[in-house]
Amino acid sequence: MAENKEEDVKLGANKFRETQPLGTAAQTDKDYKEPPPAPLFEPGELSSWSFYRAGIAEFMATFLFLYITILTVMGLKRSDSLCSSVGIQGVAWAFGGMIFALVYCTAGISGGHINPAVTFGLFLARKLSLTRAVFYMVMQCLGAICGAGVVKGFMVGPYQRLGGGANVVNPGYTKGDGLGAEIIGTFVLVYTVFSATDAKRNARDSHVPILAPLPIGFAVFLVHLATIPITGTGINPARSLGAAIIYNDEHAWNDHWIFWVGPMIGAALAAIYHQIIIRAMPFHRS
């Protein structure tokens, strides 16, 4: 009888491998199918309420983003010294924290883009249709204009005197410096978005979708810490456009192209790097 029990224990112990593979090798049993690319045009979207609901979510998120962040910037510039205000770190936390909160709130509705550069990068990767991408960008820009407009309504005089939170290339830097900072900063952000929302990672690790807003917000925080002294940190064309339109100063408009060209190039490079180098999508066999 004892021998039979010992044999049962041995059989039970040998049912499983002594060591489990780490990383992606441990997930080979899970069936993963690459989602099909989004169509370039999807006319059916225009008759769907979820399409317009997503656009409204992007508008509201970008509105709140500009409202909180531009108010924070105004508070910093209004202070007599950095010690009596939130400082650059506080401004960076305001931008990163709002992205964290707003991506968390809107990810299940619109994907939580809140940024035309993010939308552009995801469009290049065929994650959404051209119809949806254009609609998102328009709603993001409108939300940003309204958000900055509300801030100006609260402080009309100080808003113009303190620069309106508009992005410009700061003294001591060239336009090339500003463009480079915007390209690299947006690359960091959009690459983080791709990595944090990767469908293959989501299939392997169930916690990834819940945690996605955290690295995205943290990336925004770090980029602001690095590039506020150079350009005030754009990396979001809607944010730059909203502040520029409401501030409406010649200096802001002279530099404004940098805050569209730079982020779009950075987003395109991030999409190419993630899709071709990291995921090797062109080499996948159907």
Curated annotation (Swiss-Prot):
Stretches in topological domain Extracellular: 77-89, 155-175, 231-257
Family: Belongs to the MIP/aquaporin (TC 1.A.8) family. PIP (TC 1.A.8.11) subfamily.
Biased composition (Basic and acidic residues): 7-18
Residue window of motif NPA 2: 236-238
GO cellular component terms, A-Z: plasma membrane
Region annotation (Disordered) ranges: 1-35
Pfam families attached to this UniProt entry: MIP
Protein name stated in the entry: Probable aquaporin PIP-type pTOM75
UniProt topological domain (Cytoplasmic) ranges: 1-55, 111-133, 197-209, 279-286
Domain notes: Aquaporins contain two tandem repeats each containing three membrane-spanning domains and a pore-forming loop with the signature motif Asn-Pro-Ala (NPA).
Membrane topology: Multi-pass membrane protein
Function description: Aquaporins facilitate the transport of water and small neutral solutes across cell membranes.
Main location: membrane
Motif (NPA 1): 115-117
Alphabetized PANTHER family for the sequence: AQUAPORIN OR AQUAGLYCEROPORIN RELATED
Annotated NCBIfam families: MIP
One GO term (biological process): response to water deprivation
Entry's Gene Ontology molecular function annotations: water channel activity
Location of this chain's protein in the cell: Cell membrane
Keyword Membrane: yes
